[in-house]
Curated annotation (Swiss-Prot):
Gene3D superfamilies linked: Rhodopsin 7-helix transmembrane proteins (1.20.1070.10)
Post-translational modification: This protein is not N-glycosylated which is unusual for G-protein-coupled receptors.
Gene: Cx3cr1
Natural source organism: Mus musculus
Disrupted-gene phenotype: No visible phenotype in normal conditions; mice develop normally and are fertile. Mice lacking both Cx3cr1 and Apoe show decreased atherogenesis. In experimental autoimmune encephalomyelitis (EAE) model mice, recruitment of natural killer (NK) cells in the inflamed central nervous system (CNS) is impaired, leading to increased EAE-related mortality, nonremitting spastic paraplegia and hemorrhagic inflammatory lesions. Mice show an increased microglial inflammatory response and neuronal death in several models of CNS insult.
Name of protein: CX3C chemokine receptor 1
């Protein structure tokens, strides 16, 4: 999915009317091996981590909160994203590539999961802003019903925003590439990359930064011994998003400039191709980190993992399982790393994972 985000261009040469052919065969070969191994790792860790989040949320007997709804949809977005990686791995190592239908579907699911995950991260930051900074005004609006409605809207937005990324994708000469109409040949790839840079990075980062800055201001204005841990977690959320996605988006922007011949030399094109593959690995692994940032940090979720482990062990050993997991029976807001996020809101707002 490197080059022309995230089309997989397996050509060994890059041609320019005003220059000699630039050999990229060694870069392509390295990228094939490197990305194949990486996709397998991200698929494994992303699948396990996000499935645990889904299991924790769906098996809880505690009433759901609006935060639970968003966390569930974030995990589902990441699962949709990682589910496409085995198909991209097959595409990388196979000479036959993907069939036309699989090419279009895999690209569609990839981008819907990609934008959906980033949009839900943004929605979670807005929800935290409403719960803490505007607690009194937003209490009645932060219901499960509102969460479901907003989540459906986010999925619709993700599909709408993702559609330009896959609407022209098809199998062509054993490659899964964008086959654009002649009038869009030069414009559409630039629009695709710009959409990723703006809607998939710059705007979400701006919203998150504003929301968490105001949250930190509010936390510092209140006396709470858990304040420092809450602030550290907020900084971790923003820093992780910035650290994982910034290098890749810079490379996407430079890839866009390449359409305007900003990088005429072959060495620069080779470096850009290599850097795009490497930064892609960093960016895509963010979906493996989401469960740790938004869920695993919660004391209740760790208790659920312990319960799940004991339950599986009992089943494997043939022992009956006597108790079910009920976070409500182990309720302890102050024991949760994220408790300060909801401590200023109503008691009914607590998430299973927070």
């Amino acid at each position: 999915m490197s080059t022309s985000f995230p089309e997989l261009d397996l050509e060994n040469f890059e041609y320019d009317d005003s220059a000699e052919a630039c050999y990229l065969g060694d870069i392509v070969a390295f990228g094939t091996i490197f990305l194949s191994v990486f996709y397998a790792l991200v698929f494994t860790f992303g699948l396990v981590g996000n499935l645990l989040v889904v299991l924790a949320l769906t098996n809880s007997r505690k009433p759901k909160s609006i935060t639970d709804i968003y966390l569930l949809n974030l995990a589902l977005s990441d699962l949709l994203f990682v589910a496409t990686l085995p198909f991209w791995t097959h595409y990388l190592i196979s000479h036959e590539g993907l069939h036309n239908a699989m090419c279009k579907l895999t690209t569609a699911f990839f981008f819907i999961g990609f934008f959906g995950g980033i949009f839900f991260i943004t929605v979670i930051s807005i929800d935290r802003y409403l719960a803490i900074v505007l607690a009194a005004n937003s209490m009645n609006n932060r219901t499960v019903q509102h969460g479901v409605t907003i989540s459906l809207g986010v999925w619709a937005a993700a599909i709408l925003v993702a559609s330009p990324q896959f609407m022209f994708t098809k199998r062509k000469d054993n490659e899964c590439l964008g086959d654009y109409p002649e009038v869009l040949q030069e414009m559409w790839p630039v629009l695709r990359n710009s959409e990723v840079n703006i809607l998939g990075f710059a705007l979400p980062l701006l919203i998150m930064s504003f929301c968490y800055f105001r949250i930190i201001q509010t936390l510092f204005s209140c006396k709470n011994r858990k304040k420092a841990r809450a602030v550290r977690l907020i900084l971790l959320v923003v820093f992780a998003f910035f650290l994982f996605w910034t290098p890749y988006n810079i490379m996407i922007f430079l890839e866009t400039l390449k359409f305007y011949n900003f990088f005429p030399s072959c060495d620069m094109k080779r470096d850009l191709r290599l850097a795009l593959s490497v930064t892609e690995t960093v960016a895509f692994s963010h979906c493996c980190l989401n469960p740790f940032i938004y869920a695993f940090a919660g004391e209740k979720f760790r208790r659920y993992l312990g319960h799940l482990y004991r339950k599986c062990l009992a089943v494997l050993c043939g022992h009956p399982v006597h108790t079910g997991f009920s976070p409500e029976s182990q309720r302890s807001r102050q024991d949760s790393i994220l408790s300060s996020f909801t401590h200023y809101t109503s008691e009914g707002d607590g998430s299973l994972l927070l």
